[in-house]
């Protein structure tokens, strides 16, 4: 399986070959489709902004569906995704913890505790109505994450936790950095909770990513040069 350095080199190669995908608005992108890799680093092309990541996770923890509740300055990208009132769909904390979205985190834990060999331990982020919800009230927010699939694999004294992320779309400059740090946060939480409930050690693994469209926008091509 590829790692983040492999992904970086694949993106650079496409850029050098001028293998572009052009959006409806005429913006060039470099895009990898249906790509699978190990998240051995928390960035691909540009180091993360940990101050912002901390604030975004705090907002996810709040489960607020309004971008103006993000601590500090609300990033322009979130303002662009939101409707006229600042409301969005993609608060990932709301998507995995809220009862309104099916208590995804709790259900995932329940499956793993009740049957460590289960294939049903998923956290479903998006929903069928996203086709309509994405643009309701002038939003531009079609959730980028489909779901997370977790497995417990036996070790000598307990289990290891495999955590696989399935993405519809991911920007390689900011999106991957922010998303993988969110998933690392949730992963550590799961390891602790599973260890307590199963009363055995839970070993960690590197997160695995499956992305339908992993891309770099034209305004960020300098990171490929």
Located regions from the model:
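Terminal, non-catalytic protein-protein interaction segments that mediate quaternary/complex assembly
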Residues: 1-225
């Amino acid at each position: 399986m590829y790692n983040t350095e492999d992904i970086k080199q694949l993106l650079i190669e496409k850029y050098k070959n001028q293998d572009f995908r052009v959006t409806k608005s005429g913006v060039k992108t470099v895009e990898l489709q249906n790509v699978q890799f190990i998240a051995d680093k928390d960035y691909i092309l540009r180091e993360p902004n940990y101050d912002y990541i901390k604030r975004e996770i705090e907002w996810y923890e709040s489960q607020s569906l309004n971008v103006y509740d993000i601590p500090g300055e609300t990033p322009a990208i979130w303002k662009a995704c939101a409707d006229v009132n600042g409301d969005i769909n993609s608060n990932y904390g709301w998507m995995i913890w809220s009862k309104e979205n099916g208590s995804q985190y709790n259900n995932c834990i329940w499956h793993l505790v009740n049957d460590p060999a289960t294939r049903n331990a998923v956290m479903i982020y998006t929903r069928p109505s996203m086709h309509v919800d994405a643009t309701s009230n002038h939003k531009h927010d079609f959730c980028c994450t489909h779901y997370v699939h977790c497995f417990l694999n036996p070790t000598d004294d307990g289990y290891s936790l495999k955590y696989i992320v399935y993405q519809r779309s991911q920007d390689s400059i900011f999106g991957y950095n922010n998303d993988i740090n969110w998933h690392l946060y949730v992963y550590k939480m799961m390891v602790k909770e599973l260890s307590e409930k199963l009363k055995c050690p839970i070993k960690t693994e590197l997160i695995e990513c499956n992305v339908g469209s992993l891309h770099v926008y034209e305004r960020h091509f300098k990171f490929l040069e």
